[in-house]
């Protein structure tokens, strides 16, 4: 989903400042913070979403995250394992106005759910940014993240060959415009404050 130029500029500035932040060490990571995975090379997800972020995880304990990942579904992962993944790095995002404890508890309700590789709003499987969207609430229990129209097209507006083939194998049309989320767009929401790079 395309963003306004001013929003893109603000996000780029935030991204640069976060990447340059030298004081943002692991001990500053709080329960309820989000970890956005920034890749070094474009892939089939970043090709159709704004920015180079292709995954998001939730800090669920001092040295642990909860995340939805392909083949495994919603799982708990040691923080060191996350940090040691080869490609790219992680940015810490703090959700302003969130009830962090309750939001993490909500995420735990999805533990063991399958991974939604089709990126559809189904109750029996879930993908990474959908976990965040469904789990995060404010102090009054109100959801903090709404959905957006899903995008499977590139900058020219053309649905990419990858996604055409992917959904064709499942006997489906590409769910362009269906309600959903993506990690890159989530990172640009006004209620997300990028705190720096996970080290």
Question: Which residue ranges define each predicted feature?
Answer:
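Glycine-rich catalytic cores of cysteine/serine-nucleophile enzymes that process amide/ester linkages
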Residues: 29-30, 34-94, 114-126
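Bacterial N-terminal signal peptides that target proteins for export
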Residues: 2-13
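Active-site nucleophile-His-acid catalytic modules used for acyl/amide transfer and hydrolysis
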Residues: 90-150
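Gram-negative bacterial Sec-dependent N-terminal signal peptides
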Residues: 16-17
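Activation targets extended, charge/polar-rich intrinsically disordered C-terminal tails
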Residues: 123-199
